[in-house]
Amino acid sequence: MTTSAPEDRIDQVEQAITKSRRYQTVAPATVRRLARAALVAARGDVPDAVKRTKRGLHEIYGAFLPPSPPNYAALLRQLDSAVDAGDDEAVRAALRRAMSVHVSTRERLPHLAEFYQEIFRHVPQPNTLRDLACGLNPLAAPWMGLSDQTVYVASDIDARLIGFVDAALTRLGVAHRTSVVDLLEDRLDEPTDVTLLLKTLPCLETQRRGSGWEVIDIVNSPIIVVTFPTKSLGQRSKGMFQNYSQSFESQARERSCRIQRLEIGNELIYVIQK
């Protein structure tokens, strides 16, 4: 068996992944990058590489969503009804329901108002706010206290999710741009005032060691907000606070970055000034 990953075999793995309802809307760049590494690990065995690629996608994406894709159309109809009724509480309730389908935002719901109030107490009001690997974070825009002039720039590897985020922000009247972006493949040098990287670095590090700070270094923002979970998806701490804080703060010192550390709920927060 070959230890290289010829393009035709990468194509075969990609085609198998796109037939999967669970992963068919993941960015092709992400699928091909994982497929290439999987083929090398599988010594060119395509069926084995497909399994490895799906396993990789589960770790960085699938584990955070329900087994079947969320019914974004139904969630959008609920939001539409609330917006049309002009009922702010109903709008927020619809947004909370939508955010609850993604583990990352669901974990934040009990502390949602406090979370963003505390962050934006340490961050100047941005004209442009970029949210990388955004998941359903942009649906929390009403809790962020952003000005009407702020442009929310959101991206993720899931085209289906990004389509929903785009539609939801449009309904909310939030100025925005959305795109499908792979943080390890695509350009990240668009200038923005503030960038959010919420619970993203651990997923990057599972794909390529050191890539978390590579992304931070490349991102063209004077202020970056990075967060880490302090409990696993199974709600075990496993020393995560200590591990993440020691490693991250060591890297920040090497780069002479100014950081502020916060902790809200099960989330460790760093406000970085580059």
Swiss-Prot record:
Transmembrane segments: none annotated. GO terms for biological process: response to antibiotic. It is an enzyme of class 2 (transferase). It holds the Pfam family FmrO. It catalyses: guanosine(1405) in 16S rRNA + S-adenosyl-L-methionine = N(7)-methylguanosine(1405) in 16S rRNA + S-adenosyl-L-homocysteine. The keyword S-adenosyl-L-methionine applies. GO terms for molecular function: rRNA methyltransferase activity. Coiled coil: none annotated. InterPro entries: rRNA_MeTrfase, rRNA_MeTrfase_GmN_bac, SAM-dependent_MTases_sf. Keywords: Antibiotic resistance, Methyltransferase, rRNA processing, S-adenosyl-L-methionine, Transferase. It comes from the Bacteria. The keyword rRNA processing applies. Its EC number is 2.1.1.179. S-adenosyl-L-methionine binds at residues 64, 102-104, 108, 133, 156, 182-183, 198, 207. Belongs to the methyltransferase superfamily. Aminoglycoside resistance family. Protects M.echinospora, which is an antibiotic-producing bacterium, against self-intoxication. Specifically methylates the N(7) position of guanine 1405 in 16S rRNA. Confers resistance to various aminoglycosides, including gentamicin and kanamycin. This is 16S rRNA (guanine(1405)-N(7))-methyltransferase. The lineage of its organism: Bacteria, Bacillati, Actinomycetota, Actinomycetes, Micromonosporales. The gene is grm.
